[in-house]
Design a protein with these regions (language model features):
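N-terminal Rossmann-like or analogous alpha/beta NTP/dinucleotide-binding catalytic cores
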Residues: 69-154
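A structural preference for short, hydrophobic beta-strand core positions in alpha/beta folds
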Residues: 60, 100, 160-161
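N-terminal catalytic cores of NTP/NDP-binding nucleotidyl/phosphoryl-transfer enzymes
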Residues: 19-82
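Positively charged, low-complexity intrinsically disordered leader regions
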Residues: 1-27
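A short acidic, often aromatic-flanked loop/helix-cap motif at beta-alpha or helix-coil junctions
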Residues: 17-21, 105-108, 165-170
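Short glycine/serine/threonine/alanine-rich loop segments
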Residues: 54-56, 95, 156, 195
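Active-site cores that bind ATP or allylic diphosphates and position pyrophosphate for catalysis
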Residues: 117-213
Length: 213
């Protein structure tokens, strides 16, 4: 388990089998949150607002690598934001803690019941917010109702946040943002993201042929 702190938002890496995290009880938003688009922001803001109303700390629980990258290593979709940018966008919403849960074979094999009774308590989560289509656990066998049913006996609850749609009633998703970018429509992508899409990278020294022209 590793942790760092930036602008009062603590960032933690955690894997199945690690010790339980120290700290206060959390109201958390959970998801992959690639690109942190407007729909993601709605889920995260719901968790933050509830945490503040109850005097608790807020968190975002996300997965690293993206599950699709784990299962489709040869043809995984491109990331809308690298980890640094993703953390920056999430922190800007005002969350107290970002927890990156490692998506590995241990997590893949964790069934829905164990996720609720073991993983969420280890992270300190007491209340969870997720998109209405959220599924988790081995074979995606769990959903919001699963958390509420199993979590009732251990003090964990979950709330489904209605998926955000655009003016044409189409749900905003990371896949739609990627499609807009691939179609050469950055303005449409930015409307769904709620911010401009940026690319970061390292500048490499070239052959310096330009100075000979």
């Amino acid at each position: 388990m590793d942790s760092s702190q930036n602008n009062k938002c603590e960032t933690i890496d955690w894997s199945v089998g690690d010790a339980s995290l120290d700290g206060p009880a959390l109201v958390a938003a959970i998801g992959n949150f690639d690109g942190v688009h407007r729909g993601h922001a709605q889920v995260i803001s719901a968790a933050i607002d509830t945490a503040r109303a109850q005097g608790l700390a807020s968190a975002v629980v996300t997965f690293d690598p993206h599950p699709r990258e784990f299962f489709r290593q040869d043809d995984a979709p491109f990331h809308l934001a690298d980890r640094q940018e993703k953390d920056r966008l999430i922190a800007a919403l005002g969350v107290d803690r970002i927890i990156h849960v490692r998506f590995d074979d241990n997590l893949r094999c964790t069934d829905a019941e164990s996720f609720v009774t073991s993983v969420l308590p280890a992270l300190g989560v007491k209340a969870l917010f997720a998109g209405a289509d959220f599924a988790f656990g081995r074979g995606r066998g769990g959903d919001i109702d699963t958390i509420n049913t199993i979590g009732a006996g251990i003090g964990i609850s979950a709330t489904a946040v209605t998926l955000l749609a655009d003016p044409n009633s189409a749900v905003i998703t990371s896949s739609r943002v990627r499609a807009a970018l691939q179609d050469g429509e950055p303005e449409r992508a930015a409307e769904m993201l709620g911010h401009d899409w940026t690319v970061t990278g390292t500048v490499q020294m070239g052959d310096q042929r330009g100075r000979t022209i």
